[in-house]
């Protein structure tokens, strides 16, 4: 249950412009936003601050609501709700209060290394009162370790970083809807009263015009039965509802005379088969709707009901239904059915009568991380409450203490269950800084109490007008979750009730004011809102007579300027952070923009990051708030700087040292590395970025590289979105990334003795052991490839009866001679790299290990992956493709000054996909690289000079530009600037005014017949790397049943020769090849051993036998009681068993043990 004005609302953070040392971007923005984007992690941080009641949060609340305001945190709320817990007789009670935390036990790095939680011990004050003796006992009780949020908005659970995603749910309240009856085609109306916790109450008018009620989804009964059960007389019902014929006819036909009969009637419908009594029936009705323990509207439900029905009043403490609520709901329903448009509420207010749209954001609210954890703690405490009651009854009253009553296990189990298994607690996406940031701002309609992807229809997934400025209409996944998972818009924040608000500038009588109001979707419906690019003069007066505005339900209209109430604060208000980083978004089709927003999250951080020539102005802020940069909170002078740490002497004389994270593995296996940006002796200001993180450059989000791109077909090699790259990109490591894999092995106690980590491995040459140290662990810096030993380990074998010779050896050499198996950890198939880290945990060193584990070793292997054929590249406009060919630099097309292009994209990738933004980005990219100089005196530049800001008339080569979404560079500006681009050092202008250049074929030296569009595009290397997908096998594991190879790279499986491949072989008449593929190369068990023998002995390949899968098919048919047998040519039944003697003999002669265990790592063929 949400409490008061307590749930944190996002606070304004430092403006981007104030970030010291920020790189300059030349912006084409025409609209200046009156406020900056709120803190991008406030959604997570503020909600958690409310839950645990941090001192900063309390200070903010007091500042907002005054010193005297009562401020309670989320945990305090639940303890108040639960207390006091009384025994069944009411003689004893236990109250819990004052939740408080001790210091966190381990640092974040220790928690990650030791695979434990980053958590703080939670204590509460428990007070036991014996009402008969008046005795009070008070104790501090330890509730358990409570996971704490890091300053980046994440949790460390069992050593891995996780994010709790905010959940979009239907808000508690009262909802009216309309359906059309199929038989009569008349509109029928219904209403649901939905609580936060408790039974649903539903009223409806059926096709026979009777008003009915359903309690808790049970059988329908006349609504007047419920009213009479509540104590209403026929006269009272007639007085209140006499205006409605359908209510009067329902009253006449309800068949109950008084309150007692009505109560018994309800009881019979709710509990069929039980013998009703008046008291039972009364308590059933009371418990259903009027007892706070069983029924809870929550503050948000009470707020929605009062607002919808015009009931006024605060009703702050009243979280159950009242008779007035029920009566007004029924009146609203019958007036709605009668076609009335307005009604007068009980307190005299005129309210509109209309149905509700369940997909409207006024009816959907967010459960943020604090509320989700609070609900889970509530579940745990209610389980604990039952235990406390039982113990109060069974224990001796004299000796009871609070500690003896409380069993904290249900609470800690509920918290552990939520973080470990809930659909909303997710493994954090750490592919790059942006993916982590957008993961924390994700909104999910799935999860407990939400929708399921199977049942969700088109309507709930679709974009709704009320999403504007609250949830991004573009950023959503492409699969079965489309529309169910969204992203918070850039300016949005969450209000105390959990509704998403977005800011607007107040307009009074056609004049802008400095007032910024945050409106919910419900409130916004009552106002007329203008666009952010509405023209106004220096005093704020709107200059246009008529203004384009947005009305209720997303309708667009033209109205007089005095009719406008509000104006958008920024053109990028409607999109999320990820989408706001797509330049020229306004020129892209929404489907491709969706792919572009999603693919930015899949970009791998490169060894050398580079800021985009063409940005949107959001890069700085996204990187700053993502939490991967090192930012100094103090001003001072850099005293010491190295790759590992930076020391700053602050102005107040204190030294601050910042440790940098070097080459650590992320959740997705990419490399997390921080690099210093400051120099020794440099002056730094508070809030300045002093070190870059992964995928950032100079404190800006930099996920890819600026590449010189040409749009042209090239010998068919870039057909169907294939990409041609310059070999130079490979050689200069322009698209090279580092990937880190973690390999873990443990030495356990087995029934036959303890496993041992050792260098002494049986039957292994010294050459193989060259990189192992004396413990048997690989040294740091060793280059390893697949099959190399990382950690030597031996496991005791089951011992058989020893021969006299073995007994003699055992007597001479002791234990060393006993039988052990080599179970060393080796580099998996297909992996190579350099060992960059070793972690050794041992029980002897008092490390906390799992039961039965004596030692655990983790090896980190880093791999430098250059770009290669088969890797996936993408731009920011959904223009993705796979590298099809890497050409030598001398074969690439080149500009007249000799500059070869980096990448060739096919022209067919543009028109059909309607993502023209990529072409405009290419043109502006060239301009940013070459620079431009506009002569204001030149008459040809007259129009350009009018629209361009003064600082954009002269821009040097290699500058960074920003073209904000919906407010960027126009086509006219781009073509005007292309005509004024700066020449190269030889004085030649390479690209014409139309953005095209004459390219020369690198192979022949001849110019191409037509000019080619050329410029710089920002390209990302995506996580879909060919190294992780390509797979080949010669011998490997088999399935025991079918005797066919397993499938998939993870199982080291074979290639499936499927139905269509068989048809291809048949089409070419390749009968023998096909027979081999289906038998001896696959599952003809006898045949494949004989073939192995024939190859070894140099004989001819024998005829194939019967495949094992055919035998399996026969067995399956026989198991269905079908008598299936194989007949020979003369019609006699054949026995399918192979010649096992030959089979075993052949195997033995080849040294193959055919009777060994079927193990995936041992059984190879």
Curated annotation (Swiss-Prot):
One of its GO terms (cellular component) is DNA-directed RNA polymerase complex. InterPro entries: DNA-dir_RNA_pol_bsu_ext_1_sf, DNA-dir_RNA_pol_bsu_external_1, DNA-dir_RNA_pol_su2, DNA-dir_RNAP_su2_dom, DNA-dir_RNAP_su2_hyb_sf, RNA_pol_bsu_bac, RNA_pol_bsu_CS, RNA_pol_bsu_protrusion. Pfam families: RNA_pol_Rpb2_1, RNA_pol_Rpb2_2, RNA_pol_Rpb2_3, RNA_pol_Rpb2_45, RNA_pol_Rpb2_6, RNA_pol_Rpb2_7. Belongs to the RNA polymerase beta chain family. It catalyses: RNA(n) + a ribonucleoside 5'-triphosphate = RNA(n+1) + diphosphate. The RNAP catalytic core consists of 2 alpha, 1 beta, 1 beta' and 1 omega subunit. When a sigma factor is associated with the core the holoenzyme is formed, which can initiate transcription. This is DNA-directed RNA polymerase subunit beta. GO terms for molecular function: DNA binding; DNA-directed RNA polymerase activity; ribonucleoside binding. Gene3D superfamilies: 2.40.50.100, 2.40.50.150, 3.90.1100.10, DNA-directed RNA polymerase, beta subunit, external 1 domain (2.30.150.10), DNA-directed RNA polymerase, subunit 2, domain 6 (2.40.270.10), RNA polymerase alpha subunit dimerisation domain (3.90.1800.10), RNA polymerase Rpb2, domain 2 (3.90.1110.10). Keywords: DNA-directed RNA polymerase, Nucleotidyltransferase, Transcription, Transferase.
